[in-house]
Design a protein with these regions (language model features):
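Residue-level signature of outer-membrane beta-barrel architecture
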Residues: 62-64, 75, 98, 195-197, ...
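Surface-exposed loop/interface segments of Gram-negative outer-membrane beta-barrel transport/assembly proteins
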Residues: 1-40, 80-85, 91, 95-188, ...
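Short structured motifs
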Residues: 55-57, 192, 250
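Periplasmic N-terminal accessory/gating domains of Gram-negative outer-membrane beta-barrel systems
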Residues: 41-51
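Alpha-helical support elements that line or immediately flank enzyme active sites
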Residues: 192, 197, 211-213
Length: 317
């Protein structure tokens, strides 16, 4: 009568004879269901971990009436919820104030921070996958190789959705976690100096000099056999629907920014009698900034040797 009954899970696919389960006898179907029933994978437990945060700080300060100092050190580390995801930060701050005499004050401060983060370069939401993935599915085959997920993408096609193309090894989320990576490293540093001089009782000079540096770098790697690499195959062109060729890639971005500022000013002030006050300010400021960024992507990348061999287009194109 044209009625379509949806396939529910792996058992529905087996009973309906979908895909690789076609032409199975009832006994073979029962044996396959029993085999799958021996496996119970808790995907939330496999994919996620307890998020632990550690922070440590140390500060020192001291000095005398004329000179004082302050130094602060910090370190923090956070493990993300998804396995192989973490974040680290290092920072140091220092400040020195000096008064050589009653007319001169000098202050110098420096700050530096380094942040590093690593995570898999996943193109599938791990929370969604853990919720919908079949507990019958295995992570590894008996020989230790990655086991292909036979239902996460296939079940939608079995129920009439678009057939998502997969590499020969199928999809395995742990292959994506272990063979893709996204590493970022950011650093910022600044140096500031302040000078104050009372030239006369009613004439003073204020000066400031500062310099800042910021750099950001990231490496995104997709291993050759990953689904992320499978979805990024520009050298196949219109043949990508039938081509099985795969190649890894690395995407690198580097950017940095420098800035400086110089400022000086003379301030004159005086009071005449009881009701008259005069104030004059003369100053100058120079500032500048420079930034540069580089983007690079290489296909055919080998993470072990660091070399890449760019694929060529098929002759049919």
């Amino acid at each position: 009568d044209g009625t379509h009954y949806p396939f529910i899970g792996a058992v529905g696919m087996i009973r309906s004879g979908y895909g690789k389960y076609a032409n199975m006898t009832l006994e073979q179907q029962n044996a396959e269901i029993a085999r799958l029933g021996e496996q119970t994978t808790d995907w939330f437990d496999e994919l996620f971990q307890n998020s632990v945060s550690n922070s440590h700080y140390l500060s020192l300060s001291g000095g005398s009436e004329k000179n004082s100092y302050y130094v602060s050190l910090g370190y923090s580390k956070n493990n993300g919820l998804v396995k192989k995801t973490d974040y680290e930060r290092y920072n140091v701050s220092a400040k020195l104030d000096m008064k050589p005499n009653k007319r001169v004050k000098l202050g110098i401060s420096a700050d530096m921070a380094i942040q590093e983060s690593t995570s898999p370069s996943l193109n599938v939401d791990p929370f969604k996958y853990a919720y919908f993935a079949n507990p019958y599915e295995r992570i590894y085959n008996e020989d230790g190789s990655y086991a292909a997920d036979n239902t996460y993408y296939s079940i939608t096609h079995a129920n009439g959705a678009y057939d998502k193309l997969l590499p020969d090894g199928g999809y395995n989320i742990f292959r994506e976690i272990n063979e893709t990576s996204n590493e970022t490293k950011n650093m910022s540093a600044s140096l500031i100096a302040n000078l104050s001089v009372n030239i006369l009782d009613n004439l003073s000079f204020e000066g400031l000099a500062s310099y800042g540096y910021v750099t950001n770098a990231s490496d995104n790697i997709n291993g050759k056999t990953t689904y992320a690499a499978w979805q990024d195959r520009p050298f196949e062109g219109s043949a990508s629907s039938i081509s099985k060729r795969t190649y890894g890639s690395i995407t690198q971005t580097n950017a940095y920014n420098t800035n400086y500022n110089l400022r000086g000013q003379l301030h004159y002030f005086n009071t005449f009698g009881r009701d008259h006050y005069i104030s004059a300010l003369l100053g100058s400021e120079i500032r500048g900034q420079y930034s540069k960024s580089i983007y690079e992507k290489r296909y055919g990348y080998d993470p072990i040797s660091g070399n890449s061999s760019i694929p060529i287009y098929p002759e049919s194109m």
